Curated annotation (Swiss-Prot):
The keyword Transcription applies. Residues 24-43 bind DNA. It comes from Pyrococcus horikoshii (strain ATCC 700860 / DSM 12428 / JCM 9974 / NBRC 100139 / OT-3). Keywords: DNA-binding, Transcription, Transcription regulation. InterPro entries: ArsR-like_HTH, AsnC-type_HTH_dom, Dimeric_a/b-barrel, Tscrpt_reg_AsnC-like, Tscrpt_reg_AsnC/Lrp_C, WH-like_DNA-bd_sf, WH_DNA-bd_sf. It comes from the Archaea. This is Uncharacterized HTH-type transcriptional regulator PH1916. One of its GO terms (cellular component) is cytosol. One of its GO terms (molecular function) is sequence-specific DNA binding. Residues 5-66 form the HTH asnC-type domain. CDD domains: HTH_ARSR. Pfam families: AsnC_trans_reg, HTH_24.
Amino acid sequence: MPEILDKVDRRLLEELKNNARENIATLSKKLGIPRTTVHYRIKRLVEEGIIEKFTIKPNYKKLNLGTTAFILIRYDPDSGLTQREVAEQIARIPGVYEVHLVAGEWDLLLKVRASNAEEIGRIVIDKLREIRGVGQTVTMVSFVTVKEEI
């Protein structure tokens, strides 16, 4: 189990979250610690699994994927498939970016991206609803994303 992060580790994570490509020298100046310390701390955070990967944040509008929708799904237990098996099939659908098993009235929560609402509809009608184990669905198209973190 990794130790609790100190203030420097938290600041370093915040800087890397804002720009994973930030170089060691710049991070050293921003944090007020030696470059070797920055390098060591990043390496330790990776080894301890606190940092799983360094990634990018795409501009989905420029990729013609500017429409985001959240879809709630009721699992059909009479399908002969487990809820996890249904979730794994859903995860393979192009345009599905997140699949969550959730508690409450609904069983799964999806985040879907497409070029427009019509394309979201095609994903729901032609792909999702064809999967055995998918019961009722509710689709909510996002007007605007106020905050989205990686």
